[in-house]
Amino acid sequence: MSDEIVTNKSVTYVNNTTPVTITSSELDLRSCYQDDEVVIEVHAAALNPIDFITHQLCNSYIFGKYPKTYSRDYSGVIIKAGKDVDNRWKVGDKVNGMYSHIYGERGTLTHYLILNPAKDIPITHMVEVPKDENDPYDDFVYAAAWPLTFGTAFSTLYDFKKDWTSDSKVLVIGASTSVSYAFVHIAKNYFNIGTVVGICSKNSIERNKKLGYDYLVPYDEGSIVENVKKLKQIVLENDKFDMIFDSVGNHDFFPVIDQFLKPKAKNSFYVTIAGNNKANYKNISWRDFVSLSSILKAINPFKKYNWRFGHPYPPNNFIEVGNEMIKKGTYKPPIDSVYEFDQYKEAIDRLMSNRAKGKVVVKMK
């Protein structure tokens, strides 16, 4: 067999009745890409909850019976480039990014990823992560760990509200998630937001203090609403929040939202990336995401506050902001655990456990 003909292994599923598995296909590196595409030999890919959500919601009658590949975040090396590819992307370049798809035959939990760098954005050249001598992870692991979560956090802060100042105040529900980790670093180090309050378990408070939160409130010691209310009255001089950001799925504040969120006229926002309830990744249904209450919050013209569903928005250039923050040392992608490719099931189980503190990454090389 020619060295240009390789076996491409990918982690795939067909629908919500089939488990994830490794599938193999033959790939001819001489002809598998178009003139405007590159072939990336993937070194690492990160898992995200969207992988489980799309898998469990995949009805074969609606979404077809072809193999669908896991994951969106990636890092790797360009090994082939079409003749029409912009010359900023060359063979040998180390790159990372987010390959956006819902039910794509191409995903990033694969050994070879083919994409169009002009269309399949964001993609960027990897930057070196500042590390100490005891750091166990290489740059490929770090590079795969941040595009989707960082992009979600940055887009939430950048796209909805434009007038952040040192007087601004934000409440983060779910301070321990990877998205919230990025959120607080971006809020404090890029937008210079004055006050960021986080809600987390009492056991996570010490960890999260080091991330930059100004104040932390436990959700497992009394009422969340009452605990935040006391903080607002005693410490924040009863000033309300410019944004409430929910990264876990919560509805506790809705009945009393006017006590915590500034008026709609002041350009305040309630932004969620998880819906109104904490998801059980092992048993997900469409009702968890397309509930009547969510629809009403999104389209109801009579509600007194702005409600939005957050997601990464590549055109806002978040990938370059992330690179700059990584180089400056103001953001370091958090890693929970790293697994080899054939340990993909253990990696999935780890993320589904809801116990991961940082990204779960799978290495291909």
Curated annotation (Swiss-Prot):
Keyword Mitochondrion: yes
Disulfide bonds: none
Keyword Mitochondrion on entry: yes
Cross-referenced SUPFAM superfamilies: GroES-like, NAD(P)-binding Rossmann-fold domains
Origin superkingdom: Eukaryota
Listed InterPro entries: ADH-like_N, GroES-like_sf, NAD(P)-bd_dom_sf, YIM1/Zinc_Alcohol_DH_Fams
Cross-referenced Gene3D superfamilies: Medium-chain alcohol dehydrogenases, catalytic domain, NAD(P)-binding Rossmann-like Domain
Gene Ontology CC terms, in alphabetical order: lipid droplet; mitochondrion
Chief location: other
Localization per record: Lipid droplet; Mitochondrion
Assigned keywords, A-Z: Lipid droplet, Mitochondrion
Family: Belongs to the YIM1 family.
Protein's recorded name: Protein YIM1
Upper classification of the organism: Eukaryota, Fungi, Dikarya, Ascomycota, Saccharomycotina
